[in-house]
Amino acid sequence: NVEERVGPSQVIRAAGQTDFTTLSLAGLHSFGPGFGFNDLKLLVELGYSYMSDTSGQAYSAQGSLPFIAGQASEGSSDQRLTRSAYGYRLALSADRHNFFNGMLSGVSFTPALRLRHDVQGNSVLGGEFLEGRKLAELEITARYGLSLEFLVKYGWFFGAADRNQLLDRDFALFDISYSF
C-alpha cells in the first residue's frame, strides 16, 4: 500500500518466498562435414520459468526500473514480473582443420554464431528473462597446434527498448591464449 509509512526501527521486507519452477530442454545436433567445414554443429536450448505467486513483487524484475533518487515511480505494466516466462538460445558452430586447403597446416578455424531471445515474460531467476531482449554474438577462433589460440568476438544487445539495461553494452573481445 502506497499510503503506509515506515517508522524508526521498523523492518522492511524486501524479499519473500514463493514456489518457482524452471524447465530447460537442450538439443545438440552434429551435421558432420558440409559447406567446406569438417564439422557443423547446432545447439538449441529452450527455457521456461513459472512463479506461483507474483503479488507484492510487481517490479522485482532485474533492471526493470531505473533508480532516480527522491522520485517514486510506478513503472509500466510491461516491467512487472510475470507468472511465466520463456525464451531460447541457439548456437551454430563449424570446425575447419588445416585451413586454406593445407596452406596453413596445423591451423584449425572455428566460426560461431549465437543468438539469445527472451520471447515472453519477465523473470529474475532461472535464466533471467526480460521480454523482448535479444543478444547476437559472432565469434571466430583460430588454433595453431594444441598450444596457441586467437579469439575475436563481437556481441550486440537489442530489443526490449528502455527496459533492457544492456542495450548500450555491445562488446568486442580479442583474446590470445598460449597453453604449455
Model-derived regions: residue spans:
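Transmembrane beta-strands of outer-membrane beta-barrel pores
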Residues: 29-31, 46-54, 94-96, 115-121, ...
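Outer-membrane beta-barrel "beta-signal"
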Residues: 147, 167-180
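Outer-membrane beta-barrel translocator domains and adjoining extracellular loop/strand segments
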Residues: 1-4, 54-61, 121-131, 160-167
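Transmembrane beta-strands of outer-membrane beta-barrel proteins
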Residues: 25, 37-46, 90, 109-113, ...
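Extracellular loop and loop/strand-boundary signature of outer-membrane beta-barrel proteins
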Residues: 8-16, 73-79, 122-127, 159-164
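Residues that define the transmembrane beta-barrel architecture of outer-membrane proteins
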Residues: 17-23, 82-88, 130-136, 168-172
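Short loop/turn motifs that connect adjacent beta-strands in outer-membrane beta-barrel proteins
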Residues: 31-42, 97-110, 142-147
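Long, well-ordered mid-to-C-terminal structural blocks that present hydrophobic/aromatic surfaces
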Residues: 1-75
